[in-house]
Amino acid sequence: MATVDVLTSEVVVPAGETPAGAVWLSNLDLAARRGYTPTVFFYRHNGEPGFFAADAMRDSLARALVAFYPVAGRLGLDGDGRVQVDCTGEGVVFATARSGHYALDDLMGEFVPCDEMRDLFVPAAPAAASCCPRGGALLLVQVTYLRCGGVVLGMALHHSIADGRSAAHFVETWASIARGAPAADAPVPPCFDHRLLAARPARAVLYDHPEYKPEPAPPARAATASTYASAIITLTKQQVGALRAACAGASTFRAVVALVWQCACRARALPPEAETRLHSMIDTRQRLSPPLPPGYFGNAVIRTSTAATAGEVVSSPVGHAARRARAATSQGEDYARSVVDYLEGVDAMNLPRSGVSRADLRAISWLGMSLADADFGWGSPAFMGPAIMYYSGFVYVMNAPGKDGAVALALSLEPESMPEFRKVFADEVARLA
């Protein structure tokens, strides 16, 4: 098994004075998955001296933390026992490491999201930091120097304080400072007013929200799987275009997820009468009136889903599955506010977070996020993606770095289903071309 040698590990605090006090967390923050979201960025050496110099990365991180000061805080409790962010300025973890085993091309050839890759390239999460007050640092960073001169930047941001778009906002700001931009000229100033997503005084739950309700114990066949096989699959711009055309012009995310859903049902050999549910997330930022500020930093996504029988998904054209996916992702402000109001009446810290059943799929869109272009002064990443997948039945849809219009999928399925999925998916993509 490959190893890395940790060279340094320290705490980086904001480079200047920051506000004290606390940041109130919304119901969507409390309902987010507990713990961290580990991600990795692979960078090819550009031939310049000082490539990803530790001092430059550390100093720019400290300056970014001035604007994003809650990231340097800790989770705590308010007087009513509600989780909040205490803006203590205690700092974040910053480590450097070296790998004598991996060159970048080797790593890109064998990388799949898994525990081993997370353990190699992302600092270990503090045991008490998942949801407990006075837990550990909310951001963990590691710069690993490969034997070829390339670099893996691994980071894990606590999900209680940021969703994917907010994480991208932080990375974009940090990268701009590393490139030499003044810290005061952040691309978009962050907004930490989470009360913009508070429940309404007169709560109005207008919809059913099964995604936030405890589920009865499923039969053995449908049990969630903590063991999984994962894969990275890339679709070219032409393949994405052909798939969207087959889906009557559906969005890239809906078209890709529709095909993944179909192929997963086939690979899992689900009975035609079995219910299969496609879970997804909706970003509420532009769906509210007025919209959230451009720099809203927190969790602004809500869970949603749509269900069908496996027979319907498999036997219908892929465009039908895309229309189902649209039904799961097209809700507007009324639905979003209904979710927030519903969560006001439940214990948001103890919602179901154990994964999805063996018949289901959870799809997350990272399309359009600046993570794929995170340039710290030495060029954009050759690859960016999640370091782990958590459980079977998970798929991220992302822009493929450096490949205009191409899409990368990070996918996890049951180990026995993955080989058949890869075959069926490749056959379907070839047939569409």
From Swiss-Prot:
Pfam families: Transferase (PF02458). Its EC number is 2.3.1.-. Expressed in roots. The active site is at 159 (proton acceptor), 375 (proton acceptor). Keywords: Acyltransferase, Transferase. Disulfide bonds: none annotated. Belongs to the plant acyltransferase family. This is Hydroxycinnamoyltransferase 4. It comes from Oryza sativa subsp. japonica (Rice). The gene is HCT4.
